[in-house]
Amino acid sequence: WISAFFILVANSWMQHPVGAEMIDGRPRMTDIGAVLMNPLAWVTFSHVITASIQVAGGFLVGIAWYKLWRRRKDGIDKVVDGKVVVGESDKGARDKKDFQVWLKSLRLGAVVGLIGFAGVGASGHMQAQMMIHEQPMKMAAAEAACHDGTSFSVLTVGELGAQSCDKIHTIIEVPGVLSFLAHDNFNTPVKGIQTLVPEYEAKYGTNLPDNPLYGERAGQKIDYLPSLEVSYWGFRGMIGLGAVVVPFYLYALWVTRKKGVGTVPESKLLKNVAVWSILAPFFAIALGWIFTEMGRQPFVVVPNLEGDPAIRLYTAAAISPGVSGEEILFSLLTLGLLYGVLMVVEVYLLIKYVKAGVVAAMPELVQSHHEDESNDKSKRDVLEFAY
């Protein structure tokens, strides 16, 4: 968490620069305290941490559901008169303790996932309000909102990739929701693209500065509109994938309640939903970061509307002129290959450990009549390396 905080402090300064002054044409930090206490950094930190908490809860729900489902499929546990009858199996030490471990893990994961989602929603609301104030064009792009209004777009169709308000149409919207996100009321209009573009041009200019930083791009016209396609669908994907698993968490708590069945259904479909739902929060976070970074274009350092407008940097200045396209491609392919290999190894190890089950992590459960299996070191010690 400490590492994440300092990374987010740096990123938040690029989104909302504070504690710096322009000296000899360059921003120089003058107040480290202001940088560390940047309001955006703390809101972003809470948003990221609660999202990671939801990821952890969802992971636990998916694995625990699978293990309980497997016990039912293998005939170890049965449901009689609406109540679970917990059985035992010598294979893998799947006894009553094993059942309790996964049952409690399922319920704990569901609770943690719900707490994480609630935190994500609360911090996300605060972050959205700061974004609308500091980066109004980002929210306008996220809504594909061409005109000032109060409505939240549920579905906008057309050629978002064309970057033209003439080619997009909102067909489903919820009145007042966008105003609530921005101002905590349902009536205050939020500025749209056609209002914001002239404001940005008047404040920051219509062309890139005549500065060596921009190389051949110096003097080119600035497009203050981020990618509508990426911003619009990235914003909805982030929210949708984070929220779609919440009913499943609630259902997991319901079917395992004290007066309920006490275990998961035999449904293979629900088992598949549980396992694949592990990925939803991961992709939600990825889309959230894509939206965050793509939505601030054309800036790499977004100007602080209440600070020195000179402290800003366009993305065109962040391009290294001494690096060729071939070198960039090689770097991307190398990093992609490296992380791809790491992903394959991680997924393989995770599957191996999940299949090994409790007996691998808690060998003390393997006693007496499980003695033969406990001597199988390949199963008993598998989590020693995992940690």
Residue ranges of predicted features:
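Polytopic transmembrane helical bundles with strong interfacial aromatic enrichment
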Residues: W1-Y387
